[in-house]
Amino acid sequence: MVVLRPVRPYSKPKVGIWLSVVEPDQLVGFAQDAELAGCDSVWVPEHLIWPDVIRSKYPYRDDGAPPVPSAVNLYDPWVLLGGVASKTTTIRLGTCVYVLPLRDPLVTARAVATLDILSGGRVILGAGLGWMAEEFAAAGIDFRTRAARCDEIVPVLRSLWSNEITSSNGRFVKLPPVHFNPKPPRGAKLPIVFGGESEHALRRAARLGNGWLGTWHTPESTRDVVARIGSYLAEYGRGDEDFEITVMVSPREVTEQVVVDFYQAGADRICVGSPRAPLRVWPEVLEKLGTVLQSPALR
């Protein structure tokens, strides 16, 4: 197998599930079933609000249409995952993705640290810049500043989680010297993984993150992106650090061979899910994943 970057976090492929349209009273049960099936992680989506009128183009559909109806139910991901944490023991808890520039970093740091402590160090902060200008307008934040805000927020989060005192005098994050306790179990090593497909997004993941979340790739396109990220990691002097590649796969596509193909292409994990995957498909999907994950090639 061709190794496309110096360090791989795992010696075998991992499989997670992305539960995008599941209600809270169903989420815990599905997460428990996923844990029993051998899945390593459960991921939930996040938006603060859903605008009534959306002119922004959704970047992961050719027609730019929003991925879900405007009346979709939205829940706080940290509260949802807290419920999952209380009823599971090993499955990791991720956001896919949390719109990082919309929040004060103190609020984000506290929510993430609390869940990481509650879960025994199982949180993955999947983060993105956001794609809806209307969502930022509703929150009173300039959409054009989201990348610059992210660049300031990430170092502050890591400092709050690891240092005795944190301060910041950035353009967007101004913070006098403060104490932040308790720290999450992994401190500054709590993983922050970035979504996004643009060149800027890939560089951001390599520069600031511990991983990348890819959307709707093939093994061939994954191989190309992983090679590019590997070159960026080397450019930023991070070539010897753990960096986790996760790629989204539709529930209808997942098979043992698909998992193997993505792993050989450089992905550490496939995340099975879809923005519109109906509730009725998940029992069958989880049963299928249980079979796939018991195959000799994945054990």
Feature names for model-found ranges:
Residues 1-299:
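Active-site-adjacent structural elements that line small-molecule/cofactor binding pockets in enzymes
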